[in-house]
Swiss-Prot record:
It catalyses: uridine + ATP = UMP + ADP + H(+); cytidine + ATP = CMP + ADP + H(+). Pathway: Pyrimidine metabolism; CTP biosynthesis via salvage pathway; CTP from cytidine: step 1/3; Pyrimidine metabolism; UMP biosynthesis via salvage pathway; UMP from uridine: step 1/1. Disulfide bonds: none annotated. This is Uridine-cytidine kinase 1. Belongs to the uridine kinase family. Coiled coil: none annotated. It comes from the Eukaryota. The lineage of its organism: Eukaryota, Metazoa, Chordata, Craniata, Vertebrata. It comes from Mus musculus (Mouse). Keywords: ATP-binding, Kinase, Nucleotide-binding, Phosphoprotein, Transferase. Phosphorylates uridine and cytidine to uridine monophosphate and cytidine monophosphate. Does not phosphorylate deoxyribonucleosides or purine ribonucleosides. Can use ATP or GTP as a phosphate donor. GO terms for molecular function: ATP binding; cytidine kinase activity; uridine kinase activity. The modification Phosphothreonine is found at residue 251.
Length: 277
């Protein structure tokens, strides 16, 4: 009798005693102006519209740009002249990035730094990010460091023609009031070489490569369907691996990791001021 009673109390355990939800973490990489953030927004939009389990999932987009290092006075002076390399791996605070993503994966509330490219400084204000069902983390070098790369449940690489990326970047920066000569000098001196040396080689780590970015709706729809299957606990899809047929090296979140408590239907998008990528 005592054993039966104990079992009944366990089934009635309060919500606070149950395991905390763990987000489905997606890494999205690609060159500057490849359309990474646009792809993230489209995935977020489609996941929000397609009511999985008759509810909206809470979705968050984070940018690697938030984790730029605090610059010294000398580095700031170079940045103002377009002479600082924001595309180099050493430009990022990888320790803080790893710690933040680790806490996100563990279902914890985190504070994400805010980086201002107008003043080239990390602002005192931070953005609080609460546990979410799906977190998309985008940036040019999100696959560069193995300890960060291995945290993603799904890795996407947005593959866009270099001429298209350059034209987008020039148009975007000119609209922000930057000098055309400085834009092109920075691109040839830092952006293009860094892409070829640091970003492009990480393409091999992607589970899915998306040619043409958001214009490739066939690929994006397949990715969204795959994410929905994973979140719904479709074991067949989980064991087969990603949409490209390759098995993942990591374990996807368990079916019970996404309880209804997070089903707020709210969507968040964190983006740094005047982001370079």
């Amino acid at each position: 009798m005592a054993s039966a009673g104990g079992g009944g109390s366990e089934s009635a355990a309060p919500e606070a005693d149950r395991p905390q939800p763990r987000p489905f973490l997606i890494g999205v990489s690609g060159g500057t102006a490849s359309g990474k953030s646009t792809v993230c927004e489209k995935i977020m939009e489609l996941l929000g519209q397609n009511e999985v389990d008759r509810r909206q999932r809470k979705l968050v987009i984070l940018s690697q740009d938030c984790f730029y290092k605090v610059l010294t006075a000398e580095q700031k002076a170079k940045a103002l002249k377009g002479q600082y390399n924001f595309d180099h791996p050493d430009a990022f605070d990888n320790d803080l990035m790893h710690k933040t993503l680790k806490n996100i994966v563990e279902g914890k509330t985190v504070e994400v730094p805010t980086y201002d490219f107008v003043t080239h400084s990390r602002l005192p204000e931070t953005t609080v990010v609460y546990p979410a069902d799906v977190v998309l983390f985008e940036g040019i070098l999100v696959f560069y460091t193995q300890e960060i790369r291995d945290m993603f449940h799904l890795r996407l690489f947005v593959d866009t023609d270099s001429d298209v990326r350059l034209s987008r970047r020039v148009l975007r920066d000119v609209q922000r009031g930057r000098d055309l000569e400085q834009i092109l000098t920075q691109y040839t001196a830092f952006v293009k070489p860094a892409f070829e040396e640091f970003c492009l080689p990480t393409k091999k780590y992607a589970d899915v490569i998306i040619p043409r970015g958001v214009d490739n709706m066939v690929a994006i729809n397949l990715i969204v369907q795959h994410i929905q299957d994973i979140l719904n606990g479709d074991l067949c899809k989980r064991h087969r691996g990603g949409p490209n047929g390759r098995n993942h090296k990591r374990t996807f979140p368990e079916p019970g990791d996404h309880p209804g408590v997070l089903a707020t239907g709210k969507r968040s998008h964190l983006e740094s001021s005047s982001r370079p990528h």
